Amino acid sequence: MAECGASGSGSSGDSLDKSITLPPDEIFRNLENAKRFAIDIGGSLTKLAYYSTVQHKVAKVRSFDHSGKDTEREHEPPYEISVQEEITARLHFIKFENTYIEACLDFIKDHLVNTETKVIQATGGGAYKFKDLIEEKLRLKVDKEDVMTCLIKGCNFVLKNIPHEAFVYQKDSDPEFRFQTNHPHIFPYLLVNIGSGVSIVKVETEDRFEWVGGSSIGGGTFWGLGALLTKTKKFDELLHLASRGQHSNVDMLVRDVYGGAHQTLGLSGNLIASSFGKSATADQEFSKEDMAKSLLHMISNDIGQLACLHARLHSLDRVYFGGFFIRGHPVTMRTITYSINFFSKGEVQALFLRHEGYLGAIGAFLKGAEQDNPNQYSWGENYAGSSGLMSASPELGPAQRARSGTFDLLEMDRLERPLVDLPLLLDPPSYVPDTVDLTDDALARKYWLTCFEEALDGVVKRAVASQPDSVDAAERAEKFRQKYWNKLQTLRQQPFAYGTLTVRSLLDTREHCLNEFNFPDPYSKVKQRENGVALRCFPGVVRSLDALGWEERQLALVKGLLAGNVFDWGAKAVSAVLESDPYFGFEEAKRKLQERPWLVDSYSEWLQRLKGPPHKCALIFADNSGIDIILGVFPFVRELLLRGTEVILACNSGPALNDVTHSESLIVAERIAGMDPVVHSALQEERLLLVQTGSSSPCLDLSRLDKGLAALVRERGADLVVIEGMGRAVHTNYHAALRCESLKLAVIKNAWLAERLGGRLFSVIFKYEVPAE
C-alpha cells in the first residue's frame, strides 16, 4: 500500500503489525461496507477480492422553481447547487504474502460489519490448505472454485475494462514496457499460465475455452533445480542470481559447436546449442549466478517454443503470459519474449498483464457474483486507490524493491452506464486516444509532471474555496495534495506504473484524488456564476451574429467557438487572467486569438463545405461551462439547426475542472430555449438532443463512450463530429481517424505546448478533415 511505503514499512513482522493497526481505509478500504468476498491463495501470495459500497459526495444542480413569480431576478443564478451523498459500487483487490494471512483475516473479522454473504469463493492451491482457517476466522463457508476457470474469467475482465492492461516487454527500450490499446474484440487468444508447471489454454469466447497443452517443466522446475544447483531456497533470490549471471559460461553456444561455419547455416553464433552443455566437460566450478541464468534460459526457451507451437497450431497471434513465474520480473519477461520472437520469427506476440497477479481472485469473485451480473457493467480503475504496476526487478536493491510496502492494491469503480466505441471510428482496434505517450517522450514527461506539481497549490486553494462552510476542507485538501504529490513522484520514477503515461492520465488521476477526499466539483460555484453571466449575454451575441452576412457570420461563429474555448480554468495562463481581471470577457478573449492564418487552418475548406448540402446530423463534444458552451457552442449549434442539421450535444457525465456537465447543459439549454425560438423548437422536435458522454474527464476517449450515445449516433446517422478544446482535440484525438467529416478545434493555452507545435500562446487549431473515399 502506498501509505505503508511512504512511512518506510517493509516486509518484517514489525512492519506488518504497524500496517495492520492502520485505519481500515488505509489498507482494507471500505471494509465495513463489504458485501461479498473471494480469495486466491497461491504458494506464496494471497489475493483478496471484495465488493463494497462507497459513500461519497456529489454536486447536483437543478433549476430554481420560478412558479408564482412574474419575472426572474436579473442577477439570480441560473440554477442551485446542492451537495448530496451518493452510494456507488467498488471492487477492491489486495495482494499480500501468505505469511500475513492469519493477521489479515483477524483484521477483516474485527472490521466486518455489513457483509450480506455467508460464503467466500476461494481458488488456488491454498484454498484447500487454509480452508479451515478462513472458515474459523471469518465464519464464512468456503466455496472452492476451479483455478483455470477463475484465471480465464479474470483475464477477460481486465482486458475488457482496464485500458493499457496488456503490454509487450522490450529489453532495450526506455521504458521497457510498451502498452497495448484496448482491443474491442479480445477473442480468441492463448493464455499460458506458468506456475509450478505450465498450462496452456485457448480462449474463444467469454464462456468457451479449452486446455490445449502444458508441461511439467515450469516455475517449480526453475525453483527446484535452482535450489539444488545453488543451495538458494527463495524464488526471488534465484531470479536475483540469474539477473547477474552469464549463461554462456555454462551453455554450449552454436559458435562453440560449429566455429565460424555457423554463418553458412544462417544461425547466430550466440544461440544456445545445448543448455548446460559446457558443464559436462569443463573442469572449473560454475558460479551460482551463471547456473541460475542458464537454468532460466533453458526453462523460458522451452515454454516459449511450446507456446509458439500451440499458437501456430490454433492460428493465434496473441499469447498472454501469467502466473507465479512471471510476476512482473523483467528477467523472466525478457527471456520469454526473446523465445517467442525467435521461434515464431516475430509472427506471435508475447503479452503480459499489469494485473496478472489478481486474475484468479477477480475470476473467483465473478463466479460468486454471477447473480449480480457484474459483466453487464463497465468498470474503471481508480488511480487514487491503486498502487499500480511497480517494478519487481531483482536487479533492484531490497529497499527499492519494497515497492508499496507489504500490500499491493487495485480498486475498480463500477460505472453508471456501459461504455462502448464511437461507431464512427474508422478502425477501432488501431484507435489511440492520446496524442503523446509520455513514457516515450522524456522531455515532455519531465515538463508535464513538473507542470502538474507546480499547479498543486492552486488546485488545493480552489478545492478549499469550493467548500467555505466545511470545517475540515483545508485538512482534506492537504491530504489530497499529499496523495497526488506521491502519485507524481511514483510516476517520475516509474512512468509505466498505471499503463501508458499521458496528460489525460495525469488529469484523471488528479480528479480521482480530489474525489477521494470529497471534493466532487471544486469549480461548481465558478461554473454557476459564469453560466449566469453568459446567459445574460446570449441574446446580444445572437443578434450581432444574425445581423452579419452569411459568409461573415460563418467566420464569426468559428471565432466565437474559439474565443469561448479560452475560458479554461485548467490552463494556468488563463486562470491567472481570470483571477486578476474580473472584467475579462468574450470580446477580450477574441482579441487574444491568433490572427489568421492559424497554426492549423482548414477554415477555407470548412467554408467551402458549408456552401454544399447540410449535414444530416452533427455530434458535438463540448468543453467548458460558461462563455464556452453558451456564447461559443450554442450559437454554432443554432446555425447548424437553421441549416437543417440535427445536433447531438454531448457533455461530461460528471464534473472535471470547469467542464460543462450533462446536467448543467440541460438547464442551460432550457434557459436558452426561453430566449431563442430556434433552440426552443429544436428541443421540442428532438432535432437537438443533449446526451452524456459517460466520462468525467477533461479529455476524451472515443473507445469508452456511453452506450446510449453510441446508439443515438447510429440511429440519427451522424455524419459530422465536432470536438473542441485542448483536452479533447489536442491532448487526445488529434490523430483520431473517423468515418465521417470532423472538426477539431482548440486554442493552445499552454506556452510550452504551443512552442512545441510551432506556435505561440493562444495559437489556434482548426482542423477540418474529410475521410478518404
Swiss-Prot record:
One of the GO biological process terms: coenzyme A biosynthetic process
Binding positions (Mn(2+)): 623-624, 659
Binding residue positions for acetyl-CoA: 196, 199
Annotated catalysed reactions: (R)-4'-phosphopantetheine + H2O = (R)-pantetheine + phosphate; (R)-4'-phosphopantetheine sulfonate + H2O = (R)-pantetheine sulfonate + phosphate; (R)-4'-phospho-S-sulfopantetheine + H2O = (R)-S-sulfopantetheine + phosphate
Sequence motif Subfamily II EGMGR motif, location on chain: 724-728
GO molecular function: ATP binding; metal ion binding; phosphatase activity
Record-level GO cellular component terms: cytosol; nucleus
Subcellular location: Cytoplasm
Keyword ATP-binding listed: yes
Listed cofactors: Mn(2+); Ni(2+)
Name of the top EC class for this enzyme: hydrolase
Stretches assigned to coiled coil: none
Modified residues (Phosphothreonine): 406
3'-nitrotyrosine modified-residue sites: 320
Residues the record lists as N-acetylalanine modifications: 2
Function: Phosphatase which shows a preference for 4'-phosphopantetheine and its oxidatively damaged forms (sulfonate or S-sulfonate), providing strong indirect evidence that the phosphatase activity pre-empts damage in the coenzyme A (CoA) pathway. Hydrolyzing excess 4'-phosphopantetheine could constitute a directed overflow mechanism to prevent its oxidation to the S-sulfonate, sulfonate, or other forms. Hydrolyzing 4'-phosphopantetheine sulfonate or S-sulfonate would forestall their conversion to inactive forms of CoA and acyl carrier protein.
PANTHER family to which the protein is assigned, alphabetical: 4'-PHOSPHOPANTETHEINE PHOSPHATASE (PTHR12280:SF20), PANTOTHENATE KINASE (PTHR12280)
Protein name, entry field: 4'-phosphopantetheine phosphatase
Organism, scientific name: Homo sapiens (Human)
